[in-house]
Amino acid sequence: MKKLIAYYSRSGQNYFGGQIKEVEVGNTEKLANIINEVMDGDIYKIEQVNPYSNDYKTCVKQAMEDNKNNSRPELKNMLDSIDDYDVIYLGYPNYCGTMPMAVFTFLDSFDFSDKTVYPFCTHEGSGFGHSLNDLRKYCSNVERGIEIVGSKVDQKKDEIISWLKEIQWLNKQREEIV
């Protein structure tokens, strides 16, 4: 099974443990890197051609406006295809109760009907929000994901690895049945 770890993440000012802090690596990117260490797939960062501001408050306003307008921001370095992948780990921070609009652009760009998707989400208290319902509109096979408080990603590595081992075990069981 060929795996893709696709994620959206942002560095700069982030809401981190109750306060705004400057981060060099976004929380979702940290989580994506942990997943890649264990699952050893191809990794793709979903990036906007015109990224949001590094200033947290400006970024929030931009994200809210994009969400309100149901925008589909143009992505840079877009993948040509996902046809070779069977499993996709899709990561994102919770923006406005769902995925960032750039993730919707990514989802609009490909056919996910024969893909198994494992979502992973970072947040500061809002969990997946309604992102799983939104994701199921694009992907027919969304499996159990993981949501992690972004400011605690570094402390949750064991929990993340346990989730990934469970996925590996379930996939092995499915292969034995078939």
Model features per residue range: what roles?
Residues 1-87, 97, 104, 158-178:
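N-terminal beta1-alpha1-beta2 submodule of the flavodoxin-like/Rossmannoid cofactor-binding fold
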Residues 11-13, 49-51, 94-98, 124-127, ...:
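Solvent-exposed loop/turn segments at secondary-structure junctions
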Residues 32, 103-108, 132-135:
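Short amphipathic alpha-helical segments and helix-helix/interface helices
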Residues 39, 110, 139:
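Active-site catalytic pocket residues across diverse enzymes, especially alpha/beta-hydrolases
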Residues 67-70, 91-93, 149-155:
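Short, highly charged low-complexity linear segments
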Residues 82, 108-114:
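Short, conserved loop/helix-junction motifs that constitute active-site signature segments
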Residues 90-91, 119:
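Redox-cofactor binding/interface segments in oxidoreductases and associated redox assembly factors
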Residues 113, 118-155:
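Short, glycine-/small-residue-rich phosphate/pyrophosphate-handling segment
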